[in-house]
């Protein structure tokens, strides 16, 4: 496996051979932000990154442990790094997972790793690095401040970035082990979040993706206390955070996109603000299922029976609203009737972008004890049926875009044709949604620049994507 891109290459004092660190980041955007913090701190202390395991003095692997496939990938990557380098520090969600004998899983499988930490453990990782690869001393580099709360090294393209507003989760969904690895909800101080956001916009970010385990619950742990930003009071709450982010983004013409938003009644307050256009009318809402009995077995928060009603009300207020969601098919005990209820919900809710997992037992999850585990072939068959309906809904909604003029953020400068491009509209988050394939501009001299916004008339569809002609 190739370590993280050399976009993170760090400067070294003249004449000094700086120690080199290989880095691999696995898992979700929340893990990616942890990686960015570690890499920023490494840079601040004068370490360099290596493109290869062999060329590094040691390797850091940031792991994922949410589902079995992710566990296997993480363990395989650690093994590869050990084979090619021999000195490996492990961090991330898998680092907090116990093995069969009650000890640490990673140390049971790979006892030669140098150190293991859980997620969101920048200082612990740095302590391990200092132990096994002492940092170079430089009087100028040593004055660089710490990275937390500031915009440091980013692993995303320059024009978009993830902004993590909290760590952990207060829910105990039966299929999930994240709280056991990342702990209960801890909201970042609102002033730190806003400071990082402004630094990102100043650095050229055109799209800010707000992430957490539960964005809607931001501030619950601190009882929505009032913080300060630019000398003004700002409540530690999702609505006030989003309003202030929009205010900061406006001079830069940048987008603000919300992810992991649970359908609490408090989200109703955000929708009118989305209708003004100051924040993208896009919500990533993890519904997981629609049937009340399945939701109870899942121990999902919020009132699932009213989700359809809530969605319809949101779209009445904000007709341009796009909903992305993820679901689980074949959860233990799911009957055919309950699954049909889910398919009907998908049709009626008109979910723009839907993903689905066939239920897979996760070691340590309470759902493993629920009676009625379905055969794998039934779970996979239901996932396939779900995705067929999801594609029908998505295709119909995409077709309605034909003839519209949309703002597109350019991700690639070469696409369909010699001077075409690829970008995304407000309806598409990076990596998980569709694209807008931009046809070559009518003026031969005009080209697309990554990170620019262009207006495009939608002239067709292409699978999950749109095709646009610049105007």
Swiss-Prot record:
GO terms for cellular component: cytosol. Signal peptide: none annotated. Gene3D superfamilies: Methylthiotransferase, N-terminal domain, Nucleic acid-binding proteins, tm_1862 like domain. It is found in: Cytoplasm. Its EC number is 2.8.4.4. GO terms for biological process: tRNA modification. Keywords: 4Fe-4S, Cytoplasm, Iron, Iron-sulfur, Metal-binding, S-adenosyl-L-methionine, Transferase. NCBIfam families: 30S ribosomal protein S12 methylthiotransferase RimO, MiaB/RimO family radical SAM methylthiotransferase. Belongs to the methylthiotransferase family. RimO subfamily. This is Ribosomal protein uS12 methylthiotransferase RimO. It comes from Delftia acidovorans (strain DSM 14801 / SPH-1). The gene is rimO.
């Amino acid at each position: 496996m190739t370590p993280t891109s050399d976009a993170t290459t760090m400067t070294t004092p003249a004449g000094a051979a700086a120690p080199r660190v290989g880095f691999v980041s696995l898992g979700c955007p929340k893990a990616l932000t942890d990686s960015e913090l570690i890499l920023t701190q490494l840079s601040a202390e004068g370490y360099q990154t290596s493109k290869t395991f062999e060329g590094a003095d040691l390797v850091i692997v940031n792991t994922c442990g949410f589902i079995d496939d992710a566990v296997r990938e993480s363990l395989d990557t650690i093994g590869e790094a050990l084979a090619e380098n021999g000195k490996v520090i492990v961090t991330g969600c898998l680092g907090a997972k116990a093995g069969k004998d009650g000890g640490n899983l990673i140390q049971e499988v790979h006892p030669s790793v140098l150190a293991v930490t859980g997620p969101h453990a920048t200082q612990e990782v740095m302590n391990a690095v200092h132990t096994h690869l002492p940092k170079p001393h430089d009087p100028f580099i040593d004055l660089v401040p710490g990275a937390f709360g500031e915009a440091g090294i980013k692993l995303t393209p320059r024009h978009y970035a993830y902004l993590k507003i909290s760590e952990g989760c207060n829910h105990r969904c039966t299929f999930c082990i994240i709280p056991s690895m990342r702990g209960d909800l801890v909201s970042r101080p609102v002033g730190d979040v806003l400071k990082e956001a402004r630094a990102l916009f100043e650095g050229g970010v055109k799209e800010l993706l707000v992430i957490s385990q539960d964005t809607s619950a931001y501030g619950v742990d601190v009882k929505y206390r009032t913080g300060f930003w630019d000398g003004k009071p700002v409540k530690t709450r999702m609505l006030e955070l989003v309003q202030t982010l929009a205010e900061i983004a406006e001079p830069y013409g940048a987008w603000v996109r919300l992810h992991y938003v649970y359908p609490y009644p408090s989200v109703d307050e955000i929708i009118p603000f989305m209708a003004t256009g100051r924040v993208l009318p896009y919500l990533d809402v993890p519904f997981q299922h629609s049937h009340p009995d399945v939701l109870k077995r899942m121990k999902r928060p919020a009132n699932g029976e009213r989700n359809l009603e809530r969605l319809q009300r949101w779209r009445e207020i904000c007709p341009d609203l796009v909903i992305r969601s993820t679901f689980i098919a074949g959860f233990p005990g799911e009957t055919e009737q309950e699954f049909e209820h889910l398919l009907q919900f998908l049709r009626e809710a008109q979910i723009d972008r839907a993903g689905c997992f066939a239920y897979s037992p996760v070691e340590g999850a309470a759902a493993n004890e629920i009676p009625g585990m379905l055969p794998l072939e039934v779970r996979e068959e239901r996932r396939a049926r779900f995705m067929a309906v999801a594609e029908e809904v998505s295709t119909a909604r995409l077709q309605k875009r034909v003839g519209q003029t949309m703002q597109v953020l350019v991700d690639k400068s070469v696409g369909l044709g010699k001077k075409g491009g690829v970008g995304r509209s407000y309806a598409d988050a990076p990596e998980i949604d569709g694209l807008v394939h931009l046809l070559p501009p009518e003026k031969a001299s005009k080209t697309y620049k990554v990170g620019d916004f262009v207006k495009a008339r939608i002239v067709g569809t292409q699978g999950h994507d749109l095709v646009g002609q610049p105007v």
